[in-house]
Amino acid sequence: MSVLPFVRGVDFTKNDFSATFPSSMRQMSRVQWLTLDRTQLAEIPEELGHLQKLEHLSLNHNRLEKIFGELTELSCLRSLDLRHNQLKNSGIPPELFHLEELTTLDLSHNKLKEVPEGLERAKNLIVLNLSNNQIESIPTPLFIHLTDLLFLDLSHNRLETLPPQTRRLINLKTLDLSHNPLELFQLRQLPSLQSLEVLKMSGTQRTLLNFPTSIDSLANLCELDLSHNSLPKLPDCVYNVVTLVRLNLSDNELTELTAGVELWQRLESLNLSRNQLVALPAALCKLPKLRRLLVNDNKLNFEGIPSGIGKLGALEVFSAANNLLEMVPEGLCRCGALKQLNLSCNRLITLPDAIHLLEGLDQLDLRNNPELVMPPKPSEASKATSLEFYNIDFSLQTQLRLAGAAVPPSMPSSATPKDSTARKIRLRRGPRSEGDQDAAKVLKGMKDVAKDKDNEAGAVPEDGKPESLKPKRWDESLEKPQLDYSKFFEKDDGQLPGLTIWEIENFLPNKIEEVVHGKFYEGDCYIVLKTKFDDLGLLDWEIFFWIGNEATLDKRACAAIHAVNLRNFLGARCRTVREEQGDESEQFLSLFETEVIYIEGGRTATGFYTIEEMIHITRLYLVHAYGATIHLEPVAPAITSLDPRHAFVLDLGTHIYIWMGERSKNTLNSKARLMAEKISKTERKNKCEIQLERQGEESAEFWQGLGMTSEEADAAEPPKEHVPEDYQPVQPRLYQVQLGMGYLELPQVELPEQKLCHTLLNSKHVYILDCYTDLFVWFGKKSTRLVRAAAVKLSRELFNMMDRPDYALVMRVPEGNEMQIFRTKFAGWDEVMAVDFTRTAKSVAKTGANLTQWARQQETRTDLAALFMPRQSAMPLAEAEQLEEEWNYDLEMMEAFVLENKKFVRLPEEELGRFYTGECYVFLCRYCIPIEEPENGSEDGANPAADVSKSSANNQPEDEIQCVVYFWQGRNAGNMGWLTFTFTLQKKFKAMFGEELEVVRIFQQQENLKFMSHFKRKFIIHTGKRKDKAHTAKGKSPVEFFHLRSNGGALTTRLIQINPDAVHLNSTFCYILHVPFETEDDSQSGIVYVWIGSKACNEEAKLVQDIAEQMFNSPWVSLQILNEGDEPENFFWVALGGRKPYDTDAEYMNYTRLFRCSNERGYYTVAEKCADFCQDDLADDDIMILDNGEHVFLWMGPRCSEVEVKLAYKSAQVYIQHMRIKQPERPRKLFLTMKNKESRRFTKCFHGWSAFKVYL
């Protein structure tokens, strides 16, 4: 059955119908529009007379001289386009204008010398175009009858006047009289044309004497064209036309414009090119809607452009070429909407610096300015705020949402330093227009509503305490795979209430039409989506996948898989429900208004491979150059088609022969070989054999492929030159198949720059590419099945309409499996294969060769939740004492060893708890952990007395013995101690205690709480080694200075030796200062000061005294307790290097936090260190963020990456914004510090700061 009777419209543009016109056109009895442009028609085809329902006919750019006959029989014709032909008055029948439905007539660009006879009978005309003819006069009756005209174009004729009846055109909106000799005509009919919106009088010899002074009476006039006249100045009546939107005054003799231009408040386009203007009026800057200003070829200089031009906030195009400009005002760079700026052919010396801030500028023309020196670009640092950091949104609102925290209702803006560049950007934006102000009001209202919702959902507590992050549900914490669902579903799916159904075809979901909803094939599977609104007005979904009884395994599996993909695509929380044929749930059946209908068989094909014999048709292609690429043009597979100047490709399916003429170019030969390789790889699975054939050396198989033997080829005439030198293949025509309710349409796709690009192909549609010798039907992946079937039939009809050679074919091309012959018809389609030799082929196939472009399209994973977590609170003293008591109660025995002379020896009892930074210690701890006895009684109601008697009969359970070995390594100790322990002492311990032995390696100031509890807060760290007696440069015993401090609780109390300097004192802490005396017998005599700060707590004051008495328990040492302010000048301050200012409080201890920024997990994360952090937590490979409550430091390790630097910088900014909301009374400033360049404000946050450990 032919589909031509169902065709409603078709575009045959650029088809050659000069020889014969398709007779099958008669079958298109329902066609309503028909385009036959550029079809080389010399007369009206007879077949058009059968198209009785034709309403729109276009025949422009043909060779028509007469249109007698068939057109007059088209009673439904409403629009007729006959422009660009060779029509004369004698070739237009008067009967044509008897068509009552005719409303649009275009006879422009013909050879008419007068208005066609009988035109006045076409009383229903609303559009009439008679331009570009040779008409000398308009007959009086014409405008008496054509009073409904809306558009009238009489330009480019020889009219000297218009009839008085022109005033009857009261409905006329567009009147074009351009380029007519109307010097003696004053247009007195204008006041009657009150509906006129467009008036074009270009080249009508207007002067001040014959200018229509009544033009200001046209209340609806929007566009006025007065170009190409001899106006020395603009008449005053033009200034009074306040409704003007577009005004063209180019090619006149204007020397000035008055201040009256400010009346044109609606003006959007003003063309003043090619006049004698010296200056533009300042009132021009008062036109808020002006978008285009053209002042080319005038006499403007720097002073001629008003300085207030920056007020034109809507200006998009400014062109001032061929003037006398040496400089332009800086205000021009404040036009934020400027897109095109033309200053060519001037005398420019330089431009304002703000020219670089015009971010929306697309075109900048500065040619022919030989003395121009461009200003330097502003510093890139000023633009850092607008840079994107690896596709990560570092806004505080976004990061709070990702972390699961409540977004505060108000976000205060940070105080930023003044920036001249930013100020210029703000000035460039200019004042807001009325539309912007209205939009701002709407935006403010939306913000207020959002604030109210935020106050209800997650308001900040009144007590000011930081909120704890609510833990996510288990299903929310599951990581969703980063998949691109756009290949399966469209953006609009699930966004509107209703029912949407997909069928599974070739492993993929394919949306079906609404008319077949509720009709399921037994051999298919479907995905059903129900979209609705819930009680809160939010979208809600129900997802089902239906399984037919006869469906294949691949369809069943893919239905379930893509149902889950649909849920992930929508972000739905619902389940995907499985429905089987004959066992559907009531919920599923209620989705359909009628009963579900089962249809036998299957509508879609399985995705599994089916083995079938491939039938290859012998094709011979002519290889010809087309720009930088080549095209393969099919020719007849015969020896007569060969040309010695060209290369040919003979495709036999399993074999491809490259025939090279004796005078063919090597470039074409090599590209033909490359094309054959592509065909073999992409279409034949590399199983095709490629063979080169040179002229005169052809093989017998080659001639056999052309249907002849070698003897016949030798007897035949050799190939001759028959391909024309200027050979051009037929320009392909791309049609889009459109399907409606009972009709088909076949419009042509408009080609940008007349080039076929593969980007024109949309996956939702079906296209027909007509190349004359080949006709391709391209199926988009998302196109419907009905459109595909219609396209196949329509392509066959289109193929038969034209006289094509015998070797022409119709081929189907599915999206994603396009053949190379099809690809060569498009410019730049897969000419170069993506290759990156630094990565695997699988990686390149997944991301493409351009890894940077792929990365910009990805959503980078980050974890900044630690920045928004509340600070870890300090452990209360009572809880610390309880833990210390419990852990020491379980401790049955602890033996201590120290590395001495490459072996571990027992540590003297008096040195327990005293550590040295250059030593390694081993502690063997034996814990006796009691096993809790089961409670008496049972859940099943058994007799308790029986249980007691039973338990007494059995032996009591023994306590669990646990052995733990702690290996403590000082900061300055090498790894030799750990190796010695591993190969000696650890083996002995394992032999004694078996596999139950637990070994814990700990480093200085990174001890766990259980280990430190065994020393009962008397944990002392000395500098150096045990038996090395330190001496100063003068040979004296050095002064020892110890600092007592606890980080995050009493269990982390340490007494650490630091550099003796008064600057380290702090009124909140306690210190021990040992000043040795010089003696001849080398006895350890001296004086010990216990310095107690005025703000130190009583517990630490008592503790430091006990430690001092234990450390320096010698009759030769004097112990003194000093309160802050009672220090003796002689020994105390001299030992500390003199009196110096020091801190009087340690408020930072309540705010100090340390974060680590790293990429070690494969993505950027920020993790917080525990409150008991130390100097060794500063890793060289990472970046650390330190907050002391007053400053935020960004510490850079020497081996950190540039990526971490950028991301950590943005993270610190987000953290500061967050803390500004949480603690507005403590604003923080951001500082940068590097390793070995830390300031006192940074180092005071670390207990026992010293030189960094050197790694060998």
UniProtKB/Swiss-Prot annotation:
One of its GO terms (cellular component) is cytoplasm. Consists of a leucine-rich N-terminal half, which is likely to be involved in protein-protein interaction, and a C-terminal half which has high sequence similarity to gelsolin and is therefore likely to be involved in actin-binding. Pfam families: Gelsolin (PF00626), LRR_1 (PF00560), LRR_8 (PF13855). It comes from the Eukaryota. One of its GO terms (biological process) is actin filament severing. GO terms for molecular function: actin binding; actin filament binding; calcium ion binding; phosphatidylinositol-4,5-bisphosphate binding. Keywords: Actin-binding, Developmental protein, Leucine-rich repeat, Repeat. Gelsolin-like repeats lie at residues 512-589, 633-703, 749-822, 1168-1242. The lineage of its organism: Eukaryota, Metazoa, Ecdysozoa, Arthropoda, Hexapoda. It comes from Drosophila melanogaster (Fruit fly). May play a key role in embryonic cellularization by interacting with both the cytoskeleton and other cellular components. Alternatively, it may play a structural role in indirect flight muscle. Vital for embryonic development. InterPro entries: ADF-H/Gelsolin-like_dom_sf, Gelsolin-like_dom, Leu-rich_rpt, Leu-rich_rpt_typical-subtyp, LRR_dom_sf, Villin/Gelsolin. Found in ovaries, larval fat bodies, brain and adult thorax. Residues 405-476 are annotated as: Disordered. This is Protein flightless-1.
